[in-house]
Amino acid sequence: VTSYTLNEVVPLKDVVPEWVRIGFSATTGAEFAAHEVLSWSFHSELGGTSASKQ
């Protein structure tokens, strides 16, 4: 089994509205494959307050 890790810091403050939904998408073209998100975390800081979801 091949395992990959994606880690990216993206400053969204200037490009998204106050409320957003986050989703995942994957493709292999015409071939069948199973994709699993085994874990993920989200952290947000707005005006001195912070919220985390894991």
UniProtKB/Swiss-Prot annotation:
Record's signal peptide: none
Keyword Transmembrane: no
Keywords: Lectin
Pfam families xrefs: Lectin_legB
GO molecular function: carbohydrate binding
Entry keyword Transmembrane: no
Quaternary structure and partners: Tetramer of two alpha and two beta chains.
Record-stated family: Belongs to the leguminous lectin family.
This protein's name: Lectin alpha-1 chain
Source organism (scientific name): Lathyrus hirsutus (Rough pea)
